[in-house]
Amino acid sequence: WYDFLLYGITAALVFNREFFPQISPAMGTLAAFATFGVGFLFRPLGGIIFGHFGDRLGRKRMLMMTVWMMGIATALIGVLPSFASIGWWAPVLLVTLRAIQGFAVGGEWGGAALLSVESAPKNKKAFYSSGVQVGYGVGLLLSTGLVSLISQLTTDEQFLSWGWRIPFIFSVVLVIAALWIRNGMEESTEFEQQREKPVVKKRLPVRS
């Protein structure tokens, strides 16, 4: 959630100037928030695709993939050249990376919630699954706090030039930590039992 929400915070402060300077400030802000919305459009698609393969290949494997996708997309935003450097390719690449973020978080949300419920004791399933929602708040606090800290430690010119990029690149640290944690996880017992069951293919009746 840190990566996904960080984009929205920075879009309001920087992206209208860095990636949409060719239009008016008001329209640039609207364009920046429009790219923010792209992530939400791709979330359902990510949930469907990762959910489909998660039922066949495992929740853990899909969650490892979503972390990789989210981390790489976020870090690349942190090193993405501005409109002044590469022209229209800058906003095009920004939208593409935002779409990848949305696609990844769609799979992350459903997969993490499902794994939490399946791995929890029978009398604590609701409590364990609430951790997914808690992660949203933690990500919001961390992203907001880091952007605020860097903006206080830099001048306006420095923040617009390179300071805003630091929280995005910092995502690499969080990705490494998340991969280390998830590598030690095990698939839920429910999934393992379901995978061991023989698959029965039902034939559809053919009308004469």
For each feature predicted by the language model, list its residue ranges:
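Extracellular/periplasmic helix-loop-helix junction of adjacent transmembrane segments
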Residues: 11-45, 63, 83-92
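C-terminal ends and interior cores of transmembrane alpha-helices
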Residues: 21, 68-87
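Helix-loop junctions at membrane interfaces in 12-TM secondary transporters
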Residues: 26, 79-96, 153-160
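Central cavity-lining transmembrane alpha-helices of secondary-active solute carriers
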Residues: 33-52, 61, 66-75, 138
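Cytoplasmic helix-loop-helix junction between adjacent transmembrane helices
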Residues: 87-134
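Glycine-rich segments within core transmembrane alpha-helices of 12-TM secondary carriers
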Residues: 104, 124-151, 173-174
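Symmetry-related core transmembrane helices of the 12-TM Major Facilitator Superfamily/SLC fold
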Residues: 161-179
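Flexible cytoplasmic inter-helical loops of multi-pass small-molecule transporters
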Residues: 183-204
